[in-house]
């Protein structure tokens, strides 16, 4: 599914609106009430099940966007500005367990993780071996109230583009229906594959709404190893360092009359890395 990354990435956006109709969302909300959880938790479980099918792994990790608006802070719902952050969400899936058990475990994990929603992602990554991101997909769940306008100001035809270094970002916009937006690097993920992944996500959510008492392996189907890791991908800084050793005087960057050669670029990068990690 994923191919070797290119430089620069070929960013693209696909919009799916809606994929879950009003009746499906109502069934999903009823499931959330029955299991004393939230729609956001059910969507997280659904995305974890998708990743299981795509990777063939029962232990998956993805990036989850959190609001950063702790309900324990008075007046936080009226505060202006973005407090959003990203946390790694790890889901361990027991194929023999019921989906209800998986939902309960996910809700408990969400509660435990609430105290870390304002933590810096970089701090968490620095504690990992090799400072590597433990995920390559991101899920963002938006649930803004639409029935209570504030003041006379109205916004129309608003478009927001979101891009980052991850090859696939899914935004689920919850209203009476659930619309899906996919932001992806099409040099690594073809558009038709992205659509297939989003369709799978919607189908899994419909299944969750109607069959929460069955076993996970019966709901998600057999693991489908479609997503495969890249064969020993080389990081850009390694390539720059290797090139600097071979041709230190070759021009790496040029801006107007300013010229930076590979040897100097490598030296500056190492100094900056030492400063940031120090």
Spell out what each predicted region is.
Residues 1-13, 65, 90, 109, ...:
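Non-catalytic, low-complexity flexible loops and terminal extensions
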Residues 11-30, 100, 104, 159-179, ...:
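AMP-binding/adenylate-forming domain of the ANL superfamily
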Residues 14, 31-44, 53-157, 186-190:
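His-Asp-centered acyl/peptidyl-transfer active-site segments
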Residues 38-50, 196, 200, 271:
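Short amphipathic alpha-helical face segments that pack within enzyme cores
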Residues 39, 172-191:
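Histidine-centered acyl-transfer/condensation active-site motif
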Residues 43, 139, 194, 240-243, ...:
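Adenylate-forming
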Residues 103-110, 195-208:
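Short amphipathic C-terminal alpha-helix that caps PH/PH-like domains
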């Amino acid at each position: 599914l994923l191919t070797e990354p290119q430089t620069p990435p070929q960013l693209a956006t696909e919009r799916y609106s809606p994929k879950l109709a009003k009746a499906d969302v109502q069934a999903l909300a009823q499931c959330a009430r029955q299991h004393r959880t939230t729609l956001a938790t059910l969507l997280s479980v659904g995305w974890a099940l998708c990743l299981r099918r795509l990777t063939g792994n029962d232990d998956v990790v993805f990036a989850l966007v959190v609001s950063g608006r702790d309900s324990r802070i008075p007046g936080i719902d009226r505060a202006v500005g973005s407090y959003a952050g990203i946390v790694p969400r790890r889901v361990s899936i027991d194929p023999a367990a019921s989906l209800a058990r998986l939902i309960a475990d996910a809700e408990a994990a969400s509660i435990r993780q609430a105290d870390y929603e304002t933590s810096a992602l970089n701090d968490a990554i620095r504690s990992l071996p090799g400072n590597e991101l433990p995920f390559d997909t991101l899920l963002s769940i938006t649930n803004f109230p639409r029935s209570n306008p504030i003041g006379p100001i109205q916004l129309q035809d608003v478009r927001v583009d979101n891009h980052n270094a991850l090859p696939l970002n899914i935004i689920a916009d919850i209203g009476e229906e659930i619309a899906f937006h996919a932001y992806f690097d099409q040099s690594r993920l073809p558009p038709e594959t992205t659509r297939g992944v989003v369709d799978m996500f919607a189908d899994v959510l419909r299944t969750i709404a109607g069959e929460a008492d069955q076993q996970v392996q019966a709901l998600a189907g057999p693991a489908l190893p479609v997503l495969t890791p890249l064969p020993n991908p080389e990081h850009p800084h390694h390539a720059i360092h290797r090139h600097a050793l071979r041709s230190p005087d070759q021009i790496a960057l040029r801006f107007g009359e300013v010229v930076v050669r590979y040897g100097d670029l490598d030296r500056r990068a190492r100094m900056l890395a030492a400063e940031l990690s120090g």
